[in-house]
């Protein structure tokens, strides 16, 4: 069994039919379908060309729900209302009770993730056993002033670490360049989005994995894949050490992640954990 633990509806030209065909082509049995709620001035305008945004953000929960309703056995439903909204917890609770939401994600906002409002939501997720998928990005100059000169999310790895430690009863799933750059102890994380070169000891993400049992990570997108591909020898040791807390995921529609994982020579029981067992452990998929 294979579970893609990070993807989105109507993403990069994929309507439901294309999405399901793509899953079938690569042997993917289920997908975690994540929303992205955000004020319009907190995401780059180019996302309007790769998703169907509305007043709630680039990837509305309504689109996730539409996919789930039409193919209930193929998707695990995620929803991440903006924690800064006064009704965030109420909306999430309603989505859980009415629609069977099982994930809180994707959280991708210009706020520090140790914000007290965010911590309240994270603790609620822990009580309801919803894993929390977060996107972290550092400031990189876009060359323009408007709508924003850069697109940072989360406040860096330190703010994320404080949140993870402040909410030990909540499972967090790290994702995106600002998380995966910290697989290495070098100083590239705030200089380039996708660092290259051998992984050096002392990476903050590795330290967090060893110290925070409630931290998981998905291998999605160029950031997760790139973190492994930059040093295949280290990638194998990393996957072996943290085999119980890594999730196969794509955030795209190609097969590069499977191809690379399968090339590492990992034991079949380790691949089984990464491909599906860890995801199933966090949220047992339900047909609704």
What are these regions (language model features)?
Residues 26-55, 72-74, 139-144, 176, ...:
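Active-site gating loops and adjacent loop-to-helix segments of metal-dependent hydrolytic enzymes
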Residues 1-13, 65-67, 73-79, 213-216:
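Mobile, glycine- and charge-enriched loop segments
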Residues 1-7, 12-38, 93, 237-247, ...:
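Mid-to-C-terminal alpha-helical segments outside catalytic/metal-binding sites
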Residues 102-103, 115-247:
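Catalytic pocket-lining loop regions of alpha/beta-barrel enzymes
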């Amino acid at each position: 069994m294979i579970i893609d633990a990070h993807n989105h509806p109507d993403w990069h030209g994929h309507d439901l039919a294309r999405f399901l065909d793509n899953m079938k082509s690569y042997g993917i049995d289920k997908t975690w379908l994540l929303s992205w709620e955000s004020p319009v001035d907190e995401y780059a305008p180019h996302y309007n060309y790769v998703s169907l945004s509305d007043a709630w953000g680039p990837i509305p929960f309504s689109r996730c729900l539409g996919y789930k309703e039409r193919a209930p056995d193929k998707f695990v439903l995620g929803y991440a209302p903006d924690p800064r909204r006064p009704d965030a917890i109420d909306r999430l609770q309603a989505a859980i009770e009415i629609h069977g939401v099982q994930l809180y994600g994707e959280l991708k906002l210009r706020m520090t993730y140790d914000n007290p409002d965010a911590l309240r939501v994270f603790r609620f997720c822990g009580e309801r056993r919803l894993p929390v998928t977060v996107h972290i990005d550092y400031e990189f100059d876009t060359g323009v002033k408007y709508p924003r000169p850069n697109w940072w999310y989360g406040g860096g790895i330190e703010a994320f670490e404080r949140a993870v430690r402040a909410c030990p009863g909540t499972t967090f799933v790290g994702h995106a360049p600002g998380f995966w750059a910290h697989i290495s102890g070098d100083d590239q994380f705030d200089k380039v989005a996708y660092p290259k070169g051998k992984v050096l000891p002392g990476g903050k993400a590795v330290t967090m994995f060893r110290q925070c049992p409630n931290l998981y990570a998905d291998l999605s997108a160029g950031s997760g894949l790139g973190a492994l591909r930059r040093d295949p020898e280290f990638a194998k040791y990393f996957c072996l050490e943290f085999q119980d807390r890594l999730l196969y995921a794509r955030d795209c529609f190609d097969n590069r992640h499977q191809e690379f994982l399968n090339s590492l020579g990992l034991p079949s029981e380790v691949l089984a954990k990464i491909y599906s067992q860890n995801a199933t452990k966090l949220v047992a998929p339900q047909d609704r």
